[in-house]
């Protein structure tokens, strides 16, 4: 089992009866191949493989001082009977499972782990983009079907594909991941533009454009923004109709940033070229989601929310959570998202 790298593993000097009661609600969210034993440095740890229902959350947090979670809802309903909770530590960067205002009213600090998966999410962004732009599913199938062995020439390129060089790469969300993607896109020879949903971006390295310009000019459009009232269904039917018919959409942000029904219709009607998704509206993918009916892997590739989940990234995530707890117990604020 892989242990967390980079954490200081410093034991705090506290009496045994002062140690925290810590609950890990979704141990499986970081994978069973990555150790969470370091958390035991801080007290009595109760570990659950997964926590699904509201009742499970309520029962499991009721005596906890520290709650470590990923997707479990942590709000008034689930926390009102948990008087001792002082810290919620996300095994994630996202924290939309937490009611930050309620937690603040209770004096509960919420922390997240930042920048642990930047490299991996950027890498996966291009894995999707390259697979779709080069029609790799088609050509892999062509070889494995025996057609390549049966043909009378050395090469086959029956479905045209294009280079990244010289294309325009549009980005929504110029944070750590967006900036990393921008640098890689530049290395491929792309022109990078971006749109700031809030209008408050301080990035001066790339041209900031309005939303319509982003949609109409981008050959590749990748999403790296959090889910908020401003970004929910940001990519809807109206937005998709403004994109190039050859454009490739990549969503490694949050599923509900894209209207999945509108995307399905845009792909079926060939309003855009292709889409690569690591997230969908409701996860796991529901059979009723129309995207589940689209089987053409040259037009649509969906991966099961794994862009963040390399072994290295998951190990850094545990280490980051460890450091957040250690800082909290020293009376310091580290990665607190509801100050």
Task: Describe these PLM feature segments.
Residues 75-79, 193, 197-290:
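Rossmann-like adenosine-cofactor binding region
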Residues 114-168, 180:
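Phosphate-binding beta-alpha-beta segment of Rossmann-like dinucleotide-binding domains, i.e.
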Residues 174-175:
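Glycine-rich Rossmann-fold phosphate-binding loop(s) that bind the pyrophosphate
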Residues 246, 252-339:
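Rossmann-like dinucleotide-binding domain for NAD(H)/NADP(H)
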Residues 2-7, 11-66, 193:
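N-terminal glycine-/charge-rich "phosphate-binding" loop or analogous flexible N-terminal tail
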Residues 25, 70, 91, 224-226, ...:
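Short, well-ordered coil/turn residues at beta-beta hairpins
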Residues 49, 91-92, 108-119, 196, ...:
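Short beta->alpha connector loops at strand-helix junctions that form conserved
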């Amino acid at each position: 089992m892989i242990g967390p790298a980079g954490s200081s593993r410093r034991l705090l000097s506290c009496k045994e009866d002062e140690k925290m009661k810590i609950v890990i609600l979704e141990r499986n969210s970081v994978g069973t191949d990555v150790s969470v034993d370091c958390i035991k440095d801080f007290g009595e740890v109760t570990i659950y493989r997964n926590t699904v229902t509201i009742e499970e959350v309520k029962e499991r947090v009721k005596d906890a001082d520290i709650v470590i979670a990923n997707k479990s809802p942590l709000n008034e309903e689930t926390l009102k009977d948990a008087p001792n909770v002082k810290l919620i530590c996300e095994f994630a960067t996202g924290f939309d499972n937490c009611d930050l205002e309620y937690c603040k009213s209770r004096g509960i600090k919420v922390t997240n782990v930042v920048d642990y998966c930047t490299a991996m999410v950027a890498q996966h962004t291009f894995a999707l983009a390259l697979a779709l732009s080069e029609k790799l599913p088609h050509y892999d199938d062509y070889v494995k079907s025996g057609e390549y062995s049966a043909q009378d020439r050395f090469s086959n390129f029956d479905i045209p594909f294009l280079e990244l060089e010289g294309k325009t790469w549009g980005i929504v969300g110029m944070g750590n991941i967006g900036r990393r993607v921008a640098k890689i896109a530049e290395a491929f020879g792309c022109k990078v533009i971006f749109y700031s949903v809030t209008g408050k971006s301080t990035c001066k390295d790339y041209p900031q454009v309005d939303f319509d310009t982003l949609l109409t000019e981008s050959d590749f459009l990748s999403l790296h923004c959090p889910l908020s009232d401003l970004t929910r269904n940001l990519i809807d039917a109206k937005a998709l109709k403004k994109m190039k018919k050859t454009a490739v959409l990549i969503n490694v942000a949050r599923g509900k940033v894209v209207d999945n029904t509108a995307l399905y219709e845009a792909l079926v009607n060939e309003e855009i070229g292709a889409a690569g998704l690591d997230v969908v509206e409701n996860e796991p993918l529901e059979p009723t989601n129309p995207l589940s009916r689209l089987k053409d892997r040259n037009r649509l590739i969906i991966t099961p929310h794994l862009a963040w989940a390399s072994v290295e990234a998951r190990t850094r995530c545990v280490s980051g959570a460890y450091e957040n707890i250690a800082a909290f117990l020293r009376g310091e604020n580290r990665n607190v998202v509801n100050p």
